[in-house]
Amino acid sequence: MKPILLQGHERSITQIKYNREGDLLFTVAKDPIVNVWYSVNGERLGTYMGHTGAVWCVDADWDTKHVLTGSADNSCRLWDCETGKQLALLKTNSAVRTCGFDFGGNIIMFSTDKQMGYQCFVSFFDLRDPSQIDSNEPYMRIPCNDSKITSAVWGPLGECIIAGHEGGELNQYSAKSGEVLVNVKEHSRQINDIQLSRDMTMFVTASKDNTAKLFDSTTLEHQKTFRTERPVNSAALSPNYDHVVLGGGQEAMDVTTTSTRIGKFEARFFHLAFEEEFGRVKGHFGPINSVAFHPDGKSYSSGGEDGYVRIHYFDPQYFEFEFEA
């Protein structure tokens, strides 16, 4: 399995994301550049220039017309995917940590950090109403008083958002009223990443408490746990197999003091039902910050602290592999 190496960032990768068809891969890092690549051969299509700080999150809408990015320069920006033109600039008081389009691509949500005396908020904008963008006034803003949101995704049918917090809590917020619909606490430490399954019936969380967990996306009922010895930075579900891939490694500040073998910088594959690890993929020099499955399930990508993104196309053995219970 020879990976395709994407060199487009000079700082560590913060998030990678495929569009719905999987022909494009968007990558953002702790530099101001937003890159988009052809996933089939790793050719760089272009960049979205405009941010002036680290970019924490990226999302593309259903038909890949628009791209949304959130950055530590206290802004969330909307781009035309094809031309790279900036369509909207939403200023915030603190860094934008998570962002996402709903299904129609009409409503965006993003969450801001609790820093410099400012509260953590989730803001909802309707892109069909230009006055909201021009006046920078969201139609709804949910304050998070307890611990700040570290990862968030739209729930099924765009009726709610599922948010993971610094303290390990999971909340489901209504996108209509803003109230908390469900609240659970299954993790003991910060939730770094949330990714939904292809059919949106379940999602996987990656946490600093060395585990990734599987939840039902409507009830937030805890289903499975995948245990490792290191903080998990990202986890993704395969669209056509019962497989989950975990990416992690130790804290960035501890990285230089250990050798790579001790650091455990592999991507780890677990079986969804049996919670058993069945494979590892080496490659990154440093922790893996973000993993994503291609929507066809034939490849996956990982972005690391080393600033590289690797696209791995699975060998034929992967598709013939039968898990022995």
UniProtKB/Swiss-Prot annotation:
PROSITE patterns (alphabetical): WD_REPEATS_1, WD_REPEATS_2, WD_REPEATS_REGION
Single Gene Ontology BP annotation: formation of cytoplasmic translation initiation complex
Name of a matching Pfam family: EIF3I
Residues in cross-link Glycyl lysine isopeptide (Lys-Gly) (interchain with G-Cter in ubiquitin): K282
Keyword Ubl conjugation: yes
Localization per record: Cytoplasm
A molecular function GO annotation: translation initiation factor activity
Post-translational changes noted in the entry: Phosphorylated by TGF-beta type II receptor.
Keyword list, A-Z: Acetylation, Cytoplasm, Initiation factor, Isopeptide bond, Phosphoprotein, Protein biosynthesis, Repeat, Ubl conjugation, WD repeat
Annotated WD repeat ranges: 8-47, 50-91, 144-183, 186-225, 283-324
Modified-residue entries (Phosphotyrosine), positions: Y308
Residues modified as Phosphothreonine: T219
One GO location term (cellular component): eukaryotic translation initiation factor 3 complex
Primary location class: cytoplasm
Residues where N6-acetyllysine is found: K264
Gene3D superfamilies named among the record's database cross-references: YVTN repeat-like/Quinoprotein amine dehydrogenase (2.130.10.10)
Family: Belongs to the eIF-3 subunit I family.
Protein function: Component of the eukaryotic translation initiation factor 3 (eIF-3) complex, which is required for several steps in the initiation of protein synthesis. The eIF-3 complex associates with the 40S ribosome and facilitates the recruitment of eIF-1, eIF-1A, eIF-2:GTP:methionyl-tRNAi and eIF-5 to form the 43S pre-initiation complex (43S PIC). The eIF-3 complex stimulates mRNA recruitment to the 43S PIC and scanning of the mRNA for AUG recognition.
Subunit structure: Component of the eukaryotic translation initiation factor 3 (eIF-3) complex, which is composed of 13 subunits: EIF3A, EIF3B, EIF3C, EIF3D, EIF3E, EIF3F, EIF3G, EIF3H, EIF3I, EIF3J, EIF3K, EIF3L and EIF3M. The eIF-3 complex appears to include 3 stable modules: module A is composed of EIF3A, EIF3B, EIF3G and EIF3I; module B is composed of EIF3F, EIF3H, and EIF3M; and module C is composed of EIF3C, EIF3D, EIF3E, EIF3K and EIF3L. EIF3C of module C binds EIF3B of module A and EIF3H of module B, thereby linking the three modules. EIF3J is a labile subunit that binds to the eIF-3 complex via EIF3B.
Name this polypeptide is given: Eukaryotic translation initiation factor 3 subunit I
Organism listed in the record: Bos taurus (Bovine)
